[in-house]
Amino acid sequence: MANKREFPLDRTRNIGIMAHIDAGKTTTTERILYYTGKIHKIGETHEGASQMDWMPQEQERGITITSAATTAFWKDHRVNIIDTPGHVDFTIEVERSLRVLDGAITVLDAQSGVEPQTENVWRQATTYGVPRLVFVNKMDKIGADFDYSMTTLHDRLQANAHAVQMPIGAEDKFEGVIDLIEMKADLYDEDELGTKWDTVDVPDDYKEAAQKAHNDLIEAVADVDDGIMDKYLEGEEISNAELKAAIRKATINLEFYPVLAGSAFKNKGVQMLLDAVIDYLPSPLDVRPYHATDPDTGDAVELTAGDDKPFAALAFKVATDPFVGRLTYIRVYSGTLEAGSYVLNATKDNRERVGRLLQMHSNHREEIPEVFSGDIAAAIGLKNTTTGDSLTDVDHPLILESLDVPDPVIQVSIEPDSKEDQDKLDVGLQKLSEEDPTFKAETSPETGETLIAGMGELHLDIMVDRLKREFKVAAKVGEPQVAYRETFTKETSAQGKFVRQSGGKGQYGDVWIEFSPNEEGKGFEFENAIVGGVVPREYIPAVEQGLKEAMANGVLAGYPLIDVKAKLYDGSYHEVDSSEAAFKVAASMALKNASKSAGAVILEPIMHVEVVAPEEYLGDVMGQITARRGRVEGMEARGNAQLVNSMVPLAEMFGYATTLRSATQGRGTFTMTFDHYEAVPKSIQAEIIKKNGGGVATKD
């Protein structure tokens, strides 16, 4: 018998909580869980007891690494919450959670306003079309300034953000908030952990400011809503319900961002934030249709939410749970799924059985018989499903838009202490790379050592820590290395001829290939321009494969060759001696021969580095950037500090955190994200080739 849905779709919210590191995102989530009755004791992040941060590394470092999903209930609504990390090394976690959310809360620190990582996650949310509310948190903190935070939303994000609340007091005098729609004040009782508050008239000394803010809000809503504009111009009364409905519509259309105030740590304003989630953020029925593709015809299909439609879901995260093994987090877009039934992994075109279904609450779990359209849940039993795969009804295959996964930019070698550790390391690396697509492991063809690659030093630190802790691997870890690449800068043609005839069956493969640079990010493109069968059709795939394998090891210093076009235009074969293997070798010889005149260069990752430091340290900061081969792209004032925008090679950024700390007496901060690849200077290229012991001579 089919199970009954507990909450209708219009009373379901899938939301994420996103912010810059330390803006109080995890504490905000904690309080939401506390007030919705999910937990009975509040856990503080700085004590290492937070509910959502369940990995030991998170509790020790006080930061959120993986996006834990949990379900809470508020005023007859189901709210599925995903807590996302604020550190740039974990952008894949932010990306994958935004991909499956319908709305988000952006948490700001009331003293700092919009910070660099806030800008990154805001941009990502805009890319995925996620409606947002803003919660100006830490209103109790010294230096808290609601108006300044509002200014940063306008100046740094160009967001059409408007206050729907106004704080009463700030710093240690922060007492509560004024609702600018209802025009009432909510004052909190300090002793009741935020569970009790009084709704009273707006205090006299706030009446004038609140009335002005109320009028500003109506004008701002009128700008994005014709119905409100007409009433406003006619001087007609606008009811609170009409105002809220207009704000909801504009928020869902990404034309308006409501701003609220509070202090999660001091338990103030969180219930009003929950009310705003229900009032202004979309249900799965309100968002625009999801894009999918029919794998059989290639036609675009629009998916809309509904239990009566065929099942379609996206696997957005794979995690290994110490008790139940492999968990696959799924977001259901349409249809329903019962535990024990079969699904089609449309991405890989194979059937899998879902053993059990779990509703997750951070790291506690509750078994459920069925999931419905709009739900977020975890499935057990999916052995071959990885992040970004589409799971659908067996008879209705669909491929949903997947995730953008950036390439790793930094790598370290890891050497196990014993044969037993090598086995544990292999298992650990396989599981961790399944969980996190930006984490890669490979064996160096030159040295035979294992290399692990990721998005930054902290990312790799945490992965190594997990290998030691969860998989009990004893290993030595090398110094961080840059993940260089190689490419061609000139067009050239070369022959590759492989002939071996010494009695018995010989080997014969002969190709002429034209190589040319491809656009950045386009990767390798192969073109077959053979006419008249001078290279038989059955050997063409072997030529392409031979090139791919040779490119993986580069031509200068062993780094992968990227962004190259190859056109096979001539060659010859032998009736008896030709084989796929011979043509593979011939193709690799052509690549090697071409590399001498193709202007081969080594590419290095260039990072977008933003440094925020007080004005008096500006000279030192800019000097350090220049000394690290960096280019300063621009500066802007950030409150009483300066933000320096620059492009710096990753190779020069190791140890920068320590340098910046000492140069600014601990007051400077920086964020770093990968931007693009660029050719290294000639002198450095020669050093890299020498260090890696090899390469080919290149003609300029």
Swiss-Prot record:
Family per similarity comment: Belongs to the TRAFAC class translation factor GTPase superfamily. Classic translation factor GTPase family. EF-G/EF-2 subfamily.
Query: Which GO terms of type biological process are on file?
Result: ribosome disassembly
Start and end residues of each tr-type G domain: 10-285
The record's Gene Ontology cellular component field reads: cytoplasm
Query: Cross-referenced NCBIfam families, in alphabetical order?
Result: EF-G (TIGR00484), PRK12740.1-3 (NF009379), PRK12740.1-5 (NF009381), small_GTP (TIGR00231)
What is the role of the protein in this entry?
A: Catalyzes the GTP-dependent ribosomal translocation step during translation elongation. During this step, the ribosome changes from the pre-translocational (PRE) to the post-translocational (POST) state as the newly formed A-site-bound peptidyl-tRNA and P-site-bound deacylated tRNA move to the P and E sites, respectively. Catalyzes the coordinated movement of the two tRNA molecules, the mRNA and conformational changes in the ribosome.
Q: What is this protein called?
A: Elongation factor G
Q: Which PANTHER family match?
A: RIBOSOME-RELEASING FACTOR 2, MITOCHONDRIAL, TRANSLATION ELONGATION FACTOR G-RELATED
**In terms of domain of life, where is this protein from?**
Bacteria
Tell me what gene encodes this.
fusA
Keyword check for Nucleotide-binding: yes
- Please name the source species: Lacticaseibacillus paracasei (strain ATCC 334 / BCRC 17002 / CCUG 31169 / CIP 107868 / KCTC 3260 / NRRL B-441)
- Location in or out of the cell: Cytoplasm
Q: Does the keyword GTP-binding apply?
A: yes
Q: Which CDD domains match?
A: EF-G, EFG_III, EFG_mtEFG1_IV, EFG_mtEFG_C, EFG_mtEFG_II
Entry keyword set: Cytoplasm, Elongation factor, GTP-binding, Nucleotide-binding, Protein biosynthesis
Q: Which InterPro entries match?
A: EF-G-like_DII, EFG_II, EFG_III, EFG_III/V, EFG_IV, EFG_V, EFG_V-like, G_TR_CS
GO MF term list: GTP binding; GTPase activity; translation elongation factor activity
Q: SMART domains annotated for this entry? A: EFG_C, EFG_IV
For GTP, which residues are the binding ones? 19-26, 83-87, 137-140
